[in-house]
Each structure stands twice: as structure tokens, then as C-alpha cells.
Amino acid sequence: MASRRTRETPADAAAHSTAEKPPVDSDVTPAVPTHVILKLLGFSVAMVSTPLGMYFAMSAFGMSSTFSGISAAIMANVILFLYIYVAWQEDQEEREALAAKKAKKAQ
């Protein structure tokens, strides 16, 4: 079945659509805070440079390449766990601040 359409011109439709919607203030805050991006970049640089530095430093001091590779892998995991821990702590701080704000509103 065909649907019935009104005999409205495109100019009338445009006038109705702009007249019905009040102007809204746009939110220009970034979706992700700057300190989060900087923290991610810092840990990314550390994730690349620390294992490589550890590998070449241990190789330069005469360690075998096997032990150098193992130490580089361990350092990569340490940095990964540090990043997870820092993100977890930051999330807890946000939750505590939100809970305090809700408790203040409830009073």
C-alpha cells in the first residue's frame, strides 16, 4: 500500500523544521580528557623504549641474547601492569568523587 503524503513544499518543510527546534548550546569539551591521552602516550613510549633499552643494555654488558630477551619481556609486562594499576586508581578516584557528590546532593 502506498502511504498518503502531505502536499507540503520543501520550503514549507524547512521553515517548520527550523521554527520547531530552539537553538542549543554545543558542548565543545573533548570526549577524553587531555591528562588521559598524555598518560596513554607516556606509557606507550615506555612500552616500546624500556624493553628495547633493557635488551640492548644487557647485551652490551655481555649477557646472552636469551636472558636479554627474557628481561625485555618482563619489563614490557611490568609496564603493562603499571598502566593497568594507574588506570584502576584513576577510576576509583572518579567513583569516590561521584559518590561524594551524590551524598552531598542527598543532604
From Swiss-Prot:
<dbReference type="GO" id="GO:0012507">
    <property type="term" value="C:ER to Golgi transport vesicle membrane"/>
</dbReference>
<comment type="function">
    <text>Required for the assembly of the V0 complex of the vacuolar ATPase (V-ATPase) in the endoplasmic reticulum.</text>
</comment>
<protein>
    <recommendedName>
        <fullName>Vacuolar ATPase assembly integral membrane protein vma21</fullName>
    </recommendedName>
</protein>
<keyword id="KW-0472">Membrane</keyword>
<feature type="transmembrane region" description="Helical">
    <location>
        <begin position="36"/>
        <end position="56"/>
    </location>
</feature>
<feature type="region of interest" description="Disordered">
    <location>
        <begin position="1"/>
        <end position="29"/>
    </location>
</feature>
<dbReference type="GO" id="GO:0005789">
    <property type="term" value="C:endoplasmic reticulum membrane"/>
</dbReference>
<feature type="compositionally biased region" description="Basic and acidic residues">
    <location>
        <begin position="1"/>
        <end position="10"/>
    </location>
</feature>
<keyword id="KW-0256">Endoplasmic reticulum</keyword>
<feature type="short sequence motif" description="Prevents secretion from ER">
    <location>
        <begin position="104"/>
        <end position="107"/>
    </location>
</feature>
<feature type="topological domain" description="Cytoplasmic">
    <location>
        <begin position="1"/>
        <end position="35"/>
    </location>
</feature>
<dbReference type="InterPro" id="IPR019013">
    <property type="entry name" value="Vma21"/>
</dbReference>
<feature type="topological domain" description="Cytoplasmic">
    <location>
        <begin position="88"/>
        <end position="107"/>
    </location>
</feature>
<comment type="similarity">
    <text>Belongs to the VMA21 family.</text>
</comment>
<feature type="transmembrane region" description="Helical">
    <location>
        <begin position="67"/>
        <end position="87"/>
    </location>
</feature>
<feature type="topological domain" description="Lumenal">
    <location>
        <begin position="57"/>
        <end position="66"/>
    </location>
</feature>
<keyword id="KW-1133">Transmembrane helix</keyword>
<dbReference type="GO" id="GO:0070072">
    <property type="term" value="P:vacuolar proton-transporting V-type ATPase complex assembly"/>
</dbReference>
<dbReference type="Pfam" id="PF09446">
    <property type="entry name" value="VMA21"/>
</dbReference>
<keyword id="KW-0968">Cytoplasmic vesicle</keyword>
<keyword id="KW-0812">Transmembrane</keyword>
<dbReference type="GO" id="GO:0033116">
    <property type="term" value="C:endoplasmic reticulum-Golgi intermediate compartment membrane"/>
</dbReference>
